[in-house]
C-alpha cells in the first residue's frame, strides 16, 4: 500500500533508527535528468509523518551542492548529542566523497559541509557506515578501491587490504557485518564477493558463483546470522538472488528465482531476518521469505524500473522505492493494495485504466509483530510466561521448542507466614499460647485488650476474667470494703465502752442484786417465774392519735400493711417502709421498692433500680457511653446467659452509632463477650477504612479464634457465618489462593454456604490442587447443568405436539371459487397405514371432524413415492393439479383418514414428521387394508357449503404420471433446479406401490409457500354420479392445519463453517477462468445448502461436525492439502447416508482451490 510519494529524480537515504522524527534525505541523482535538463544539484531532507493521510512529504531542509550523487547514506555519528542529527555521506563523480552535518542542513544556519575528499579515481557508488563504530565509513569506487574513513581523522584513509581483483573492477556494493564489527564485504560485477578482515588487513574468503553470467549488483549481510550474506545478479539471463553461508562457501545455500529480468537492488529487513526486498528490471518489487524461499509480497510498479529499494529503519513494514521516471514511493507491506489508493497522477491519464488488482499483504505475520515475551497471570498466583529461545539462530529455519514457564508469585509473604502459624495453632489446639503471643505482639492498646478478651473466651469461667480485664476485681473490692469498715469501727469505739460501764454499774447496784436473788429463788420454786418480764424494762406506748404515728399504729393494729407502708413513704421513712413490706407478700415488697426508687434520687439510685428490677435493657439504652465499661461489667455480673449476647450486641451497636470512631474499636469487646462473629466483622469494616492484606489477616485471626471458642462452648452445633463474615472469608480465601496457598484457602471457605461465588471458588480451588486432593470428594458442580441437545429436541417436540392438538370445532373457511380436476385414469395403488414412530410418547386418537366445504381437501397429498436425493433423503411429491388451492401447505401435514377404516386408538403419531403419506383411499369394506382401487378414475366426495344441498362431485387425479405443480407465483417446494429436473423426468411405474411412511424429517426442504388458487375446467355431468348413488370414498379432515413451519437459523458455533466455505467458493469463482470449473462451483454452492440445513437442524454427528470445523480452519489458513486429508478421514469414518449429500462437492471445491492456488 502506498503511503507517500515524491516526484524527484534523486537517490535516497533514511535517517538512522534512533532518529525522531523520521526523515528521508534525497540527493540529485547523477544517473538521471529531469524534464528541464537542469544541471543543478541539491541535498534535501523531508519529514515523514505517517499520521498524515496525504501523499505529500513535509520539506524540512535544502542545500545546494556542487555535484550530483551516485550514493547517499545517513550515519549516526554524533547523533548522541541533542544538537546533532548525524552525518550524511554522499558519493559523486570523480571520486568525490562529501560529508554534511544534518543539524545544520535542517536549521539552515552554519555551514553544513564537514569535509569533501577526492581520494578515489572513479565514481563512488558504494558507501556504508559501521553499525558498531559510527565514525568508520567504508567507500568503494572504480579500480577495486576500498577506503575506510575515520570521521575523527579524515586526512588519511586506510584500506582493508591489497586489491583482490585482477584485473581491477568497480565496487558495486559494500556492507559491514552486522554481528562482527571488523568484517566487511564487497561485491563486484564479475560475480564475486570478497570478505575482508580489518584486523588482519586482508581478505579472508571469496565467494563466487559457478555461472560466468553472475553480475553482482547488490550485497547484504543477514541481520541475525554473522556467516550469511545474499548477492543479487543484474544480468537478465540470470536474474537470481543467492544466499551464501561462509561455512559452506562451495555453493549457495539457496537460490531465489522469480524475477524475469536482472535485479537492480535489494534490502534485508533489520527487524525480521526472513524478509528480503528486491527490485528488478521487470518492474516488480518482491518481498521474499528466505526460510520458505517464496515470494510473500508482490508490488508491480506499473512505471519504469526501480533502481533502489530500502527498508525504513524506524518502521519495519515501510520501504521506499526510487524509480527511473523520477518518483520516490513510500509503501507498506502490511496494506492491501496501493492501486486502490487515490494517486495524484490518476487524473492525468485520459485513456481507460484497467481495474486495479488486489494485492494481498504478507502471507505470514512478520517477526516485528511477534511478541518477544509475554505473560499472563493464572489462578492460584501462577504466572505463565514465554520468551524467545536463548539458543543461537540456526542457518536454516528449523522448528525449535519455545519453553513456557509457570512461576508462583508471592507478594504477601508475611500474610503467608502468619497464616501458617495460625494453621499450626489450630492443628495443635494450643490457641491460648497463640493468643498470648498476639497480646505480646500488639502495638496498640485497643488491639492488646481485644486479644486479651479473645484469650478469655477460650478459658473456663470467663465472666469474672472479663470483669478483671474491665478493671473490676472481687478481691480488690473486698479489700477496699474491709478498709472502709475498719475506719468506721474505730470512730464508734468510745460509745461502746460507756455502754459497758453502765451495764457494769447496774450489775453492782442493789436493785440488780435483789433482782438476781429473786430470780434464783423463783427458778428453784417454780418455772413460771422464768417467763416473767424483767422489771427493769421501760414500757413503750402505742400511739392512737390522729397524726401520722397514730394512723400508722392503727393500720398495723388492723393488719393494713400496705397503708402503713404508704404512710412511711409519705414521711420518707424509707427504712420503716421496707421493713414493713418485708413482713407482707412479695408483691408489696416489689411495689415498695419501686416507690422507694422513684422517690429516692441519688447517684446510685439508677444503678440500684437496675439491680433490683433486673431491667438491663434500660441500662444499655440509657447509660452514658463514657460508662460503657461499667455497663458491660453489670451485664457480666447480673445478666443471664439467655439475654447476655443480645444485651452486649445492643451496647456495642449503641457505642458504634453514638460514640463515633473513638468507641468503634471498643465496641468490638462487647461483640467478643457476646460471641457475635458477624458483628465483629461489621465493626472491623467500619473501623478499617481501607482494607489491606495485613489488616484482613488480623481480622481472620480474630474471627478464627472467636469461632473456635464458640465451637468449644456449643459443641458440635456449628453456626453458619453471616453475609459479612462470608464476604471476608471469601476475600481472604482469594488472597491466600493468589499467594499459592490453595489448601489453606479452601479450609477457610464456609462448607455450608450456598452462595454462587463461594461455590464457584470452592470448585476452582479443589480442581486447582490437582493430585493433592486425590481420594477426596469433589464439591458440587457450581453451575446448573443444561443438556443443550436434549433441550432443543424437547422444544421441537413440544411445539409439534402443540400443533397436533385437535380443536373442538373446525372453523369454516372463507368462500373461494370451486375447482375441479379433469377426469382421467389413474394407476391403482395399494393403501398403506402409517407405521408408529420410534421414541414417540404422545399417543392420540384421531376423531373425525366436519368436512371442509369446497371441492378440495387442503393439505392432502397422494402417497406417491418422491424421487430420492443423495443422502437417502427424498423430495416430497408436489401437489397434483386437482388439489391446487389458496390454503397454505404446511410442512408437517396432519393425517387425513376416512372414518370407515381409521379406528380410534389405532394411530401412533410420529414425533416430528415433516410429511405423512396419504391414508388409504378405497371403497368401504370390512378389511380396507387389503382392498385396491380399480383402474377407473378415483372420485372424491366432499361436503357442500353449510346450508346448501349435498351435491356430490368428483375429482380425479391427472392421467399423466408426471408430477407437476400448480402454476402460481411461488412453487410449493423450495428445491434446486437440478432436483426439479429430476422430478419432471421421473415417471411412475405401471404398477405403483406406495413406500413406507416417512417418519424422519426432510431436512433439505424449506417451508411451503402458499399456493395460488387457479380455476380448473368443470367436469361434464356424465362423469358425476346420480343423486343418492353410493360414494366411493369420503375424505374428512381429522386435524387442523398446523402453523406454517419457520426456517431455523444457523447456530452461532457453526457460522464459521458456512462463512469459510462461502468465502472459498467466492474466491474460486473470481479466480477460475474456464466455464467448466465455474459451472462446477455453481453446482457445489447449491449442494452445500444441504450441509447448511443439516447444521441448522443439528442432525450431523459430533465426529462429522468436528471434521467440518477442522476443514474450515484449513480453508482459512489456505492449507487445502491438509483440508483434503481431513476430508478423507471424515468421509471414511462416517455414515454414507449422512455425508453423501455434501461431502463429494466439498472435496471438489477443495481440489479446485488447491489447483488454483498452485
UniProtKB/Swiss-Prot annotation:
Monoubiquitinated by the BCR(KLHL12) E3 ubiquitin ligase complex, leading to regulate the size of COPII coats. Keywords: Cytoplasm, Cytoplasmic vesicle, Endoplasmic reticulum, ER-Golgi transport, Membrane, Protein transport, Repeat, Transport, Ubl conjugation, WD repeat. Its main location: cytoplasm. Residues 485-520, 797-843, 968-1010 are annotated as: Disordered. The keyword Endoplasmic reticulum applies. InterPro entries: SEC31-like (IPR040251), WD40/YVTN_repeat-like_dom_sf (IPR015943), WD40_repeat_CS (IPR019775), WD40_repeat_dom_sf (IPR036322), WD40_rpt (IPR001680). Residues 822-840 have a biased composition (Low complexity). It is found in: Cytoplasm; Cytoplasmic vesicle, COPII-coated vesicle membrane; Endoplasmic reticulum membrane. One of its GO terms (biological process) is endoplasmic reticulum to Golgi vesicle-mediated transport. WD repeats lie at residues 4-47, 65-110, 119-159, 166-206, 209-254, 258-298, 301-341, 376-407. As a component of the coat protein complex II (COPII), may function in vesicle budding and cargo export from the endoplasmic reticulum. Belongs to the WD repeat SEC31 family. This is Protein transport protein Sec31B.
